A protein has these predicted regions:
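An N-terminal, well-structured beta->alpha segment
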Residues: 1-69, 95-96, 149-183
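Gly/Ser/Thr-enriched, mixed-charge loops and adjacent short helices
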Residues: 1, 110-241
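Buried hydrophobic positions in well-ordered alpha/beta secondary-structure cores of metabolic enzymes
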Residues: 9, 47, 85, 98, ...
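Phosphate-binding and adjacent anionic-ligand microenvironments
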Residues: 245, 281, 285-470
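Short glycine-centered, acidic/aromatic-flanked micro-motifs in structured strand/loop junctions
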Residues: 48-51, 116, 185-187, 260, ...
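N-terminal small/polar loop signature for handling phosphorylated ligands or for N-terminal nucleophile
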Residues: 33, 41-109, 198-259
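Active-site nucleophile and cofactor-binding loops and adjacent substrate-binding regions
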Residues: 74-83, 265-268, 290-292, 313-314
């Protein structure tokens, strides 16, 4: 029997490998046990899915199992972004949401996310409890459970209208529509396809969307992750001239990638910092910022400038979300391009993130390169890069021993001033850092670096790879 483990955001596995109808049914049954134990079963469960291969059928399996267990299901009648489905937890006052999605993973993967009644990522405590519930289930066939489904408890619903109403209350959509922007959208064949063009229609602003159709193979891209190497087509289209900005969404639209007016990718660290500056400077909001450890030190500097607290947490919204809610932060986010905002859900929302960036442009009348210069003028230059390296599981202990070597005092000849282990290992240098951690969603070792000079960033990453012999 498969040992189901939840990472930084849900359980993910290879389709037809470990991600089977039997294991999805086990997840659903374990979730029912959890909801009953928490007194949430009577509130019902939102169930939705993304555009991946068999996602709709997997979601139907979840709905069937939950109805067989006597739990009402609000089943999405179409593929939908994770933040849209998460918001519907609040709209329906449900006990949570089960979402079939592998987010940004390659096409051969799928996943199972659980969003509790507060509409954010499940905490470590919740996922530990869920894992135990699943592990204790007796072995039984999917058919034996589904045969007992109660179709009267499955209510089909369109999750989009409540979400769009919420977005319209947060963002000045008329301002964006009347700004006359020329916006390029890359939906990466994911569940966010069509949302931004629909939201922004009916004004002077024009929208060109690519990869907006459903294609679970994600052709032409390595994976539906909005980072530079996967955005070559939108970048080349924008480079022809006339564009104002590019907005890319990942596979389930909870993350965003921004391209400037020249089609150049804006790092997610800069995007996070620019959006935070917008909220603090233009919208005059005050409150804490919550960041993952691999986010920019520019945020700490903004906190000093505007007199707000900055909290650092391990990577993953299962860690960031609770602190975001606890301190009523104005914004929370992480290096992956996932950002949450006060007044919405304590969860990443790529669509809202993109709209806030467009609102920033419409408010100031400035293009992305100028907005980035605003940030640099305020807190100085910051350069960043990340490398993802596949590794053999058998090599993990060797890598860990090298990372934790107490005698390590330089990387690429650059003195290490200090280190922390909030998540993986982060080495602090003068006005910068290098972080090394294992991904919580994929078999990858991630290296991150930030400094005030691009050459220093490159040297840190090259030096780390040489030291780790990877």
């Amino acid at each position: 029997m498969t040992d189901i483990k939840f990472g930084t955001d849900g359980w993910r596995a290879l389709i037809a490998g470990d991600f089977t109808f039997e294991n999805v049914a086990r997840c659903a049954e374990g979730l029912c046990e959890h909801l009953n134990a928490m007194g949430m079963a009577d509130k019902g469960l939102v169930v939705g899915y993304d555009t991946r291969f068999l996602s709709q059928e997997f979601a139907q399996t979840v709905a069937n199992v939950c109805s067989a267990k006597g739990i009402k299901v609000y089943l999405s009648d179409r593929h939908a972004p994770t933040p849209v489905l998460s918001y519907n937890v609040l709209h329906h006052q449900a006990g949570g949401a089960a979402i079939i999605t592998a987010s940004h993973n390659p096409a051969q993967w799928n996943g199972f996310k659980f969003k509790p009644e507060y509409a954010g990522s499940a905490t470590q405590e919740i996922t530990d409890r869920l894992e135990r519930s699943i592990a204790q289930l007796p072995t039984r066939s999917v058919g034996s459970i589904i045969d007992r489904r109660n179709s009267s408890l499955i209510v089909n619903m369109d999750p989009t209208p409540p979400y769009l109403d919420r977005i319209a209350s947060l963002v000045d959509l008329d301002l964006i529509k009347d700004a006359g922007l020329n916006v390029y959208i890359d939906s990466m064949y994911g569940s966010g396809g069509g949302y931004l063009p629909t939201i922004l229609s009916g004004g002077k602003t024009t929208v060109t969307e690519i990869h907006g159709s459903l294609n679970p193979a994600f052709p032409g891209i390595e994976q539906p992750e909005p980072i530079a190497r996967n955005l070559t087509r939108i970048s080349s289209l924008m480079a022809k001239g006339g564009a104002s900005v590019g907005v890319a969404l990942d596979g389930d639209a909870d993350r965003v990638g921004i391209l400037d007016e020249n089609g150049q990718f804006v790092t997610t660290l800069d995007t996070f910092s620019m959006l935070a500056q917008y909220l603090l400077e233009q919208k005059k909001m005050r409150g804490a910022l919550v960041k993952g450890v691999t986010s920019s030190i520019a945020l700490n500097k903004l906190g000093e400038v505007y007199g707000v607290d900055v909290h650092e947490l391990p990577v993953g919204f299962k860690n960031i979300g609770p602190k975001f809610s606890e301190v009523d932060a104005i914004m929370g986010g992480e290096e992956s391009g996932g950002f949450a905002f006060r007044g919405h859900i304590p969860e990443r929302d790529g669509i809202l993130s993109g709209l806030y960036f467009l609102e920033y442009m419409a408010t100031t009348g400035e293009k992305p390169t100028r907005l980035l210069q605003r940030l640099t003028d305020k807190v100085g230059p910051h350069y960043y890069n990340r490398r993802d390296i596949a590794f053999q599981i058998s090599d993990r202990d060797r890598i860990l021993n090298l990372i934790n070597n107490p005698e390590l005092d330089t990387i690429a000849g650059i003195p290490i001033l200090d280190n922390d282990t909030i998540d993986g290992k982060r080495f602090h240098i003068k006005e910068g850092w290098l972080a090394v951690r294992f991904s919580g969603t994929e078999p990858l070792l991630r290296l991150y670096a930030e400094a005030v000079d691009q050459d220093i960033v490159t040297n840190l990453l090259d030096g780390a790879m040489q030291y780790l012999e990877i």
